[in-house]
């Protein structure tokens, strides 16, 4: 496993931060199908989604509904850059006139996303998660941690933490 720490200025567009952009360039290939459930202005993934209809994305769904669109083991890679805090989740929903409920502001909101990502990724598929912690998808869902990138932004700004994980290949057939 690789652990790296590279300082960079913060940006509301996570994928434009240089060390993060460099990491993405190492993992994402044009021949693969990548999805992004929280694309905002990003065009890196093959199939994009953002709850906010003001962004030019392929879909404007709640992220959970977006992930549920895909068949089991059908996606090569997932970019998972959700709102980092429950307050940010609430702001995103309110910003597009959606009701903020107990369901959208509990930690189970993220767990449901992670369950769907685990289901749709192909064996050996990659999930790149962004946030303020390094939980990622996790070993308990059959993922292997390949890389952690810490991007400190200085002062009182929270670091951006990036985890890169691979869905373990399992062959359950005996013959």
Question: Where is each model-derived feature located?
Answer:
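A short acidic, Gly/Pro-enriched loop at the edge of an enzyme's catalytic core
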Residues: 64-80, 86
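Class I S-adenosyl-L-methionine
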Residues: 135-175
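S-adenosyl-L-methionine
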Residues: 1-49, 156-163, 172-175
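Conserved acidic E/D residue at the C-terminus of a beta-strand in Rossmann-like folds
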Residues: 47-53, 62
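Short strand-turn motif at the edge of the Rossmann-like AdoMet-binding core
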Residues: 82-83, 130-133
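Short glycine-dipeptide loop
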Residues: 31, 121-127
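Short glycine-rich, flexible loops that bind phosphorylated cofactors or substrates
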Residues: 86-88, 136
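A short glycine-rich, Lys/Arg-flanked "PGG" loop and its adjoining helix->strand segment in the class I
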Residues: 94-123
């Amino acid at each position: 496993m690789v652990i790296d720490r590279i300082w960079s200025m913060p940006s509301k567009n996570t994928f434009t931060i240089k060390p993060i952009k460099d990491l993405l360039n190492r993992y994402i290939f044009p021949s693969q199908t990548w999805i992004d459930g929280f694309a905002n202005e990003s065009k890196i993934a093959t199939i994009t989604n953002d709850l906010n209809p003001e962004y030019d994305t392929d879909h404007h769904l709640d992220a959970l509904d977006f992930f549920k669109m895909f068949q089991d083991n059908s996606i090569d890679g997932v970019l998972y850059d959700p709102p980092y805090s429950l307050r940010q989740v609430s702001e995103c929903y309110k910003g597009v006139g959606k009701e903020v409920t107990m369901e959208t502001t509990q930690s189970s909101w993220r767990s449901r996303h992670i369950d769907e990502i685990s289901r749709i990724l192909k064996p050996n598929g990659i999930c790149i998660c962004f946030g303020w912690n390094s939980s990622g998808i996790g070993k308990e869902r059959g993922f292997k941690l390949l890389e952690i990138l810490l991007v400190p932004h200085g002062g009182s700004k929270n670091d951006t933490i990036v985890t890169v994980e691979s869905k373990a290949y399992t062959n359950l057939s005996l013959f």
